[in-house]
From Swiss-Prot:
This is Somatoliberin. PANTHER family: GLUCAGON-FAMILY NEUROPEPTIDE (PTHR11213), SOMATOLIBERIN (PTHR11213:SF6). The modification Leucine amide is found at residue 44. GO terms for cellular component: extracellular space; perikaryon; terminal bouton. The lineage of its organism: Eukaryota, Metazoa, Chordata, Craniata, Vertebrata. The gene is GHRH.
């Protein structure tokens, strides 16, 4: 019983961590694109 609870919460935490990493990756990618756009504007 305790094992099941542990596995459940462990899976939840893992899911939250991977979701957070995914969000960070997306945010970083968007910021990178934005920086590239700004760089292009500055060059023009």
């Amino acid at each position: 019983y305790a094992d099941a609870i542990f596995t459940n919460s462990y899976r939840k935490i893992l899911g939250q961590l991977s979701a957070r990493k995914l969000l960070q990756d997306i945010m970083n990618r968007q910021q990178g694109e934005r920086n590239q756009e700004q760089g292009a504007k500055v060059r023009l």
